[in-house]
Amino acid sequence: KSSESVYQQTAVVKGTDTVSYLIKSLTQNTTYYYRVAAYCEVSGTQIEGKLSTAVSAKTAAVSATSKGAKKYSTKAAFTKSPAYKTYKKMRSAMNYNKSFAIPGMKTTNVAGFSCTTMVPQGLCLAGSYFLITAYDYKNEQNSVIYVVSRSSKSYITTIVLPSKAKVGGIAYDGTNVWISKGKAVASFPYSVVTNAVNAGTSYTELAAYKSVSTLDSTASFMGYYNNVLWIGTFRQATSTMKGYQINNKATLPSLSPAYTMDVPSKTQGITFDSAGTMILTRSYRTKKAKSGYISQLRTYKPSFASPKSNGKVLKNTAMKVTTMPPMVKGAAVYGTYTYALFSSSYYKSCKYPVDRVIAMKESKLVE
């Protein structure tokens, strides 16, 4: 604390303008003291200036990532919620016991920093786990993946991603997990997930992606089916998503464009079942009275077996359209159920928030 105290050098930070340095692995609820000094190099020798006056900083206690539902803590509370009572089609297809709370909505431990502003985005099934992506609305903390047990539907751990991207899309190809990264998609091996689970820690930091493939437009959503990674961009009008063949899964994955498919405006998520049924979510805005509002889940049977000569796959007419509560986002299929994720629990303006991943019998979404 005093000028006579012994200080340990933490870092040498280079830069000619304002610079910053993030110090990790500090003890919670502990006061640390810091002094800085300017330096320069003369003929290869580092010359340091006088140390500054000591400045103190106390680390805060970081709460564990929340496991429970943000708004409705029990089944009784949820079944009395405006969304459950109002959206009859969702209610009739829903299996409450297979549904589960979206973790991290109250607070998320992001590598030792507490974040209460995570917004859920994408959902996929990867082996024994559901993976949920989320980004920090305030853009202060890195984006994350919540790992949830497929069998127990309970939150296990968090994977902290190496960027603050919006991570709207996530998919699993049987070997690698793919994730949105602006005008690119990045991949990392499934072993990252299993290692994070086996580590038994509250979070694991992913230092870098295994591969990054650049695109010509923003990757807002994605889904995997039959060795093709389908990637699309959220748009206010009908748009075209692209299907990419995945190369070198076991080594350094890369993508080759192969197909296209038209999708409706305001598409937020896609997923596929083993028979090739495509489940597509559309949503925009939190209030019905707002211009352009929509929130629905659609099912299609695309003509995958007979693409046109230019690679276009017809999605065909929707088999069924199910009106959903506001802000439906990612979707995943496990067994005979479709799981839908919502971001509405973050927005105070939403009168029909859903703080759970809702499991719905797929047969009721296609008939």
Label each region the model flagged.
Residues 1-28:
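Recognizes extended acidic, P/S/T-rich segments that occur
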Residues 28, 40-63:
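Extracellular fibronectin type III
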Residues 34-35:
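Hydrophobic beta-strand segments within extracellular beta-sandwich modules
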Residues 61-111, 358-367:
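Sequence/structural signature of beta-propeller modules
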Residues 103-141:
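Beta-strand-rich domains and repeat architectures in extracellular enzymes and scaffolds
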Residues 115-122, 164-171, 211-224, 263-272, ...:
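Repeated scaffold domains used in trafficking and secretory/extracellular systems
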Residues 261-309, 327-329:
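Loop/turn-rich, solvent-exposed surfaces of beta-rich toroidal or solenoidal domains
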Residues 307-334:
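Conserved blade-ending motifs and adjacent loop-strand segments that build the rim/top face
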